[in-house]
Amino acid sequence: MLARIIMSLLGWKVHKKLPAGVDRCVMIASPHTSNWDFVFTRSAFSILNIPVRFTIKDTWFKFPLNLIFGPLGGIAINRKPRKEGEERPSTVEAMAALFEKNKNLVVLVTPEGTRSYREEWKSGFYHVAKMANVPICLGYVDYKNKVAGVGMTVYPSDDIAADMKIIMRFYKDIAPKHPEKFSVDKRYI
């Protein structure tokens, strides 16, 4: 209800749902240049009844912040780089394991990894999807057209470059809030 009010008052529209039969995926949220991106994408996914979850550093998931992040869909994981010989999963392995534990799971990822400009995206989202054998759904927030939602779905193949080119073609024309802070991954255009 609150999501509909926010989107309506601010003149935003919501576009598309998850494809039929997709109840487990890695959902990219891009462009990510402003804190408002979270408000619009989270509102859109709420309206579309997509129960998105997101991973957050376990150090942030302590009282009282866990009372905020938990209800918003946060899942605590250890994101510290694994040291040689350390017996714990990498971040990618930990995220992929979430799909083994949860029948219906949509994990939201911001592939730029920051709200600042960067020419290369982080590829962990791709490796998580590949390892978990789930598709990558392309969530977006387009400030020019005031629309947020889900675009196409990419099923990871054995050719990351070809798959990433498809993803970059989709995002290259999506208008961010701060264009000077956004770039598709230059390696794949």
Q: What are these language model-derived features?
A:
Residues 8-173, 187-188:
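Soluble catalytic domains of membrane acyltransferases
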Residues 1-2:
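Helix-enriched interaction subdomains in cytosolic or periplasmic regions
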Residues 176-189:
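Charged, glycine-interspersed solvent-exposed loop segments at helix/strand-loop junctions
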